Amino acid sequence: MQHEDKTPEQQENKTPETELQQENAPATPQEAGAAGSIDDRIAELEAKLAEQQAAVLYAKAEGENIRRRAAEDIEKARKFALEKFSSELLAVKDSLDAALNVGSATLESYRDGVELTAKQLTAVFEKFSIVEINPVGEKFDPNKHQAIGTVESEAESNTVVNVLQKGYTLNDRVLRPALVMVAK
């Protein structure tokens, strides 16, 4: 076993850290340049990663904002869906109130007032695509009619001969079927 004679100063300089540094130190200037470019590349990729993470967070926040605004718009649409229809009906209500407040009216003037009010209401219905179902003479259609009974009639079998209560559709969707009597 050989014994190396080193001064205590030389032994102090040789620590595990300095040994690691010497082992990891680039042997050539090319390796030193490559290590620097790797560090630059890592820094560049970390910057891109941070940028992409920020973009993802922004997109998530934007998506949440869109969902929130859509929910608010839907709630407003529900809340005020009948606003225009209701305001149109106010004129009909005003006409009925005016008729009731007339002191000395004849039966004929009441009838005229009711007819005008019915015309107002029909105009409101037309404006909002509410269509009357009055199927006298038509073939019975269970999608639009509700048969209350059958009667003997000269009309063709399964034909509506009498309407007890008119039905209505809204944009071709049945609000209420017509109550009808059908020929046997």
From Swiss-Prot:
Residues 1-39 are annotated as: Disordered. It is found in: Cytoplasm. The keyword Cytoplasm applies. Residues 1-17 have a biased composition (Basic and acidic residues). It holds the Pfam family GrpE. Its main location: cytoplasm. Residues 18-27 have a biased composition (Polar residues). Gene3D superfamilies: 3.90.20.20, Head domain of nucleotide exchange factor GrpE. The keyword RNA-binding does not apply. Keywords: Chaperone, Cytoplasm, Stress response. It comes from the Bacteria. PROSITE patterns: GRPE. One of its GO terms (molecular function) is adenyl-nucleotide exchange factor activity. PANTHER family: GRPE PROTEIN, GRPE PROTEIN HOMOLOG, MITOCHONDRIAL. Homodimer. Belongs to the GrpE family. Participates actively in the response to hyperosmotic and heat shock by preventing the aggregation of stress-denatured proteins, in association with DnaK and GrpE. It is the nucleotide exchange factor for DnaK and may function as a thermosensor. Unfolded proteins bind initially to DnaJ; upon interaction with the DnaJ-bound protein, DnaK hydrolyzes its bound ATP, resulting in the formation of a stable complex. GrpE releases ADP from DnaK; ATP binding to DnaK triggers the release of the substrate protein, thus completing the reaction cycle. HAMAP family: GrpE (MF_01151). This is Protein GrpE. It comes from Methylobacillus flagellatus (strain ATCC 51484 / DSM 6875 / VKM B-1610 / KT). The gene is grpE.
